[in-house]
Amino acid sequence: MIIGIGVDIIEIERVRQAIQNNKNFLSKLFTEREIDYFISRNMNSEVIAGNFAAKEAVSKALGTGIRGFSFKDIEILRNELGKPEVILHNGANLIGNKLVENNNSLRVHLSISHNNSSAIAYSVLEGEYYGNM
């Protein structure tokens, strides 16, 4: 059963400027594994903006926005084929588990795309709905 959807779009230039103007931008919002991935992609602003939009989309699908947890609690990684995968930690994981009957049944689907100016992410949460939020 679908229990949440979220979408976010961001201007890539805003992310590029944030990286240039704030030396702590990446470390405040992204985990070490995410930053390692960015480095492997030559710190590509489109990739970083896509991950940022993905975190926002997942937070909206959880129904809370970024309340009760930090951006680092939503980790966006890639599998061996490059497909984005979501790992929820700490507060985000607690909120996600409150939505489903069985803590292991929450599945987070994610799609990320970008063009020259914007990055967009769409997230769908799936599981056995518990509805105790």
Curated annotation (Swiss-Prot):
One of its GO terms (biological process) is fatty acid biosynthetic process. The keyword Ion transport does not apply. It is found in: Cytoplasm. Keywords: Cytoplasm, Fatty acid biosynthesis, Fatty acid metabolism, Lipid biosynthesis, Lipid metabolism, Magnesium, Metal-binding, Transferase. It is an enzyme of class 2 (transferase). InterPro entries: 4-PPantetheinyl_Trfase_dom, 4-PPantetheinyl_Trfase_dom_sf, ACPS, Ppantetheine-prot_Trfase_dom. It catalyses: apo-[ACP] + CoA = holo-[ACP] + adenosine 3',5'-bisphosphate + H(+). GO terms for cellular component: cytoplasm. Its EC number is 2.7.8.7. Transfers the 4'-phosphopantetheine moiety from coenzyme A to a Ser of acyl-carrier-protein. This is Holo-[acyl-carrier-protein] synthase.
